[in-house]
From Swiss-Prot:
This is Uncharacterized PPE family protein PPE49. SUPFAM superfamilies: PE/PPE dimer-like. The lineage of its organism: Bacteria, Bacillati, Actinomycetota, Actinomycetes, Mycobacteriales. It comes from Mycobacterium tuberculosis (strain CDC 1551 / Oshkosh). Disulfide bonds: none annotated. GO terms for biological process: response to host immune response. The gene is PPE49.
Amino acid sequence: MVLGFSWLPPEINSARMFAGAGSGPLFAAASAWEGLAADLWASASSFESVLAALTTGPWTGPASMSMAAAASPYVGWLSTVASQAQLAAIQARAAATAFEAALAATVHPTAVTANRVSLASLIAANVLGQNTPAIAATEFDYLEMWAQDVAAMVGYHAGAKSVAATLAPFSLPPVSLAGLAAQVGTQVAGMATTASAAVTPVVEGAMASVPTVMSGMQSLVSQLPLQHASMLFLPVRILTSPITTLASMARESATRLGPPAGGLAAANTPNPSGAAIPAFKPLGGRELGAGMSAGLGQAQLVGSMSVPPTWQGSIPISMASSAMSGLGVPPNPVALTQAAGAAGGGMPMMLMPMSISGAGAGMPGGLMDRDGAGWHVTQARLTVIPRTGVG
């Protein structure tokens, strides 16, 4: 290559040196390499701090040690590459400086052109040989320009070669991050498989023991005597005992009083004619209010609050008092009891409950004794005790 520079005239060498891009791209490349070196140094420092946290921080264990061992080569590689990038920046700047020196040593193309123009003029005017010394001096100057350009090119070539020889090729990273992630994923999958293999027998054993436990409970229940099961109905018996007692007393009283009188029998007689059922006759010759009425699903009132019918105090007492109004002066209860005992052979009179089916035609207005004779009941001050529900 030196021979090439030596054989090229100054017009070509000077034109090549001054016609290029100059040293600007080399200086830009040097700045870029410096920035890359700074980024690589920062990455290496960050990696090193992360590894230090893995090995000396609170999260220390086999996994952290494995990750630190896998990532440690990256720290060395980043440090090496950062140093190489910094060296490349230095060498690029040195190459730019060498080019500038070679450019300064190269003859400007205008000087070469002027020499050639001067030589041509001298040759054209050299009729009698008078311009021979001037032509020789001009040729000597041209040869000096040639030598100067060759020397500049040789020096630039030597400097660029030394700069390039100092640069070392960049090494590849030891392992890719994707490969490291795949290795970690494989290790995690292996740990999950091991844990599943350890837990599965325990779960299967627990599920296998469930039928045995259920069979034992079934056998225990089957061995219990039936009399223990009857104890479950004891609260129901206690609650229904008062109702059963009252029903027995009412049935016994009805048996002692005998068959009902004609008036009560007539009350149970059907009304085939479809005639209107007359109103109740009064006790003692007066009417028993404005007739009987019934309602379904109507709540009672205590003040302004609606309450169930079985609440104590919810049954209006005014119904009985209004229905029994006008019966006269209430009799003496003692005398009434003695009279009932004399008429019934010493048995106290029991008021029979009114039948729902016979609460219509033919019902007498007074009470009947066992012989069918009517009792004349003098008005008494009645007190109605509301019925409370069981439970």
